[in-house]
Amino acid sequence: MELKRENVLIEALPYMQEFYDSIMVIKVGGNAMVSTQIMEDIIKDIVLLRYVGIKPVIVHGGGPEITEKMERMGKKAEFFQGLRITDDETMEIARMVLVGNINTKIVSLIGIFGGKGVGFTGYDGRMILGHKQAVKRVLVDGVETEVDIGWVGESEVINPEILHIMLEKSYIPVISPIAVDAKGNALNINADTVAGDIAAALKAKKLILMTDVSGLLRNIKDPSSRISRVNLDQIDSLIEEGIISGGMIPKIKGAAVAVKSGVERAHVINGSVSHSMLLELFTDGGVGTMLYGPDHPPV
């Protein structure tokens, strides 16, 4: 039975009180940005969070757009173990798409809906310092072969000072997942990883990962089989059972690292479902999967 509007608001009140003045890091996936309507709904929700006293930080991806741009420029996208092989030209295309297109678009939408957005990359304030990933070694026909995946990086240090300054001034930071190494080279880093690292550095209350599925499902074909809560100790067994599989494995593992590093809880939700973030945060049942550790068990 559909809840009356006043009941929805009353149900949300204790959550709003609990989350007031807290930091939440929200990772918006590239798939969510394919649809203008979905993107607008997400940004409206994030601006609303700011207006009820929550301090949101956005980390965005852009994989589909980068691939599309590469194809238009006549360059084939290549991947190795899920990582985009990033040569010099691909790195420039990634920067063009992430910083010049997606980041700017999100900041603009925040302004349209009444918020104050400001865009960043890891270069700004040397926010994300990283290093290039090591050359990969694989067996091809029984022969060990080296694979250089290019300017794909891992973060080493997050300097959150500039983010704290912006949050205190009521800005909503929007971060492109591009880091910088000790020599000033740009590095392409997985956006889920960046979001988790930034959430840990900011001591965020929540890490929210927007995907194209409604959290973890015991049966991928049955939305009603959603697992609403997962203890960190359950993750390995869920991977063994195949419930956590494919691209969800690095997302969940990254979220687990963030929780172990001080983030209270992490949430995996379907960003393509209208207002899913508000429903996950402000209703008792939620609509996604919440990850928690021993320090912050569900009440």
UniProtKB/Swiss-Prot annotation:
Site residues (Transition state stabilizer), renumbered to this chain: K27, K251
Xref: HAMAP family: ArgB
CC annotations in GO: cytoplasm
UniProt similarity note: Belongs to the acetylglutamate kinase family. ArgB subfamily.
Single GO molecular function: ATP binding
First-level EC class: transferase
Entry's localization field: Cytoplasm
Signal peptide: none
Stated name of the protein: Acetylglutamate kinase
Record has Transmembrane helix as a keyword: no
Kinase recorded as keyword: yes
Source organism (scientific name): Methanosarcina acetivorans (strain ATCC 35395 / DSM 2834 / JCM 12185 / C2A)
Domain of life from the UniProt record: Archaea
Function (record text): Catalyzes the ATP-dependent phosphorylation of N-acetyl-L-glutamate.
Listed pathway(s): Amino-acid biosynthesis; L-arginine biosynthesis; N(2)-acetyl-L-ornithine from L-glutamate: step 2/4
Known catalytic reactions: N-acetyl-L-glutamate + ATP = N-acetyl-L-glutamyl 5-phosphate + ADP
